[in-house]
Amino acid sequence: MDIRKIKKLIELVEESGITELEVQEEEGTVRISRAAPVIAPAAVQYAAAPVVAPTPAAAPAQVPAAATTAPAASDELSGHLVRSPMVGTFYRSPSPEAKAFVEVGQSVKVGDALCIVEAMKMMNRIEADKAGVVKAILINDGNAVEFDEPLIVIE
C-alpha cells in the first residue's frame, strides 16, 4: 500500500474520531488504532468525581438524623426485613405524582410491589417476599441505599 494512502487513512481516523480502522487490499492489510481518546475521557470522568463528593458532604446533616433513626428503629422492630438487592436510590412510588406502593399498616401478599430502587437509570421493582402487614418503612423517599440495607419491615 502506498504511503500516501496510509497518511490519508491516518488523517481520516484523526478527523472522524473513530478509534480503529482496518483496510484490506490486495497488497496487504493496514490497521490504525487510537488509544489516547479512550484515556482522555476517563480522566475527565475521574476529574468530575470530586465535584460529586462535595454534594454528599452537604447531605451528612441529613444522614446522621436518618442514621440515628434507623438503628433505634431496628432495635425496636421485629419482623421480616425486606433488604435492598443493590446500591441505588429508594423510591416509595413509581413516579413523584403517584401514590406510594405501600403504607405502614397495609397488608401485603408475596409478589406485591413495595418500592423501587433506581440503579444506573434502571427502575428495579422490589416485591414482598413474605405476606404480612407493613410495620415500618425504614428509608425516606429519594434517599440512597446500600446493598443489603433494610428497607421495609413486614410482620
UniProtKB/Swiss-Prot annotation:
GO cellular component: acetyl-CoA carboxylase complex
Modified residues annotated as N6-biotinyllysine in this record: 121
InterPro entries, alphabetized: AcCoA_biotinCC, Biotin_BS, Biotin_Carboxyl_Carrier/Decarb, Biotin_lipoyl, Single_hybrid_motif
PROSITE patterns (UniProt xref): BIOTIN (PS00188), BIOTINYL_LIPOYL (PS50968)
Chain ranges of the Biotinyl-binding domain: 72-155
Coiled-coil region list: none
GO BP annotations, alphabetical order: fatty acid biosynthetic process
Single GO MF annotation: acetyl-CoA carboxylase activity
Annotated metabolic or biological route of this protein: Lipid metabolism; fatty acid biosynthesis
Record-linked Pfam families: Biotin_lipoyl
Keywords: Biotin, Fatty acid biosynthesis, Fatty acid metabolism, Lipid biosynthesis, Lipid metabolism
Subunit structure: Homodimer.
Reported function: This protein is a component of the acetyl coenzyme A carboxylase complex; first, biotin carboxylase catalyzes the carboxylation of the carrier protein and then the transcarboxylase transfers the carboxyl group to form malonyl-CoA.
Name of the protein in its database record: Biotin carboxyl carrier protein of acetyl-CoA carboxylase
Annotated source species: Haemophilus influenzae (strain ATCC 51907 / DSM 11121 / KW20 / Rd)
Taxonomic lineage from the root: Bacteria, Pseudomonadati, Pseudomonadota, Gammaproteobacteria, Pasteurellales
Name of encoding gene: accB
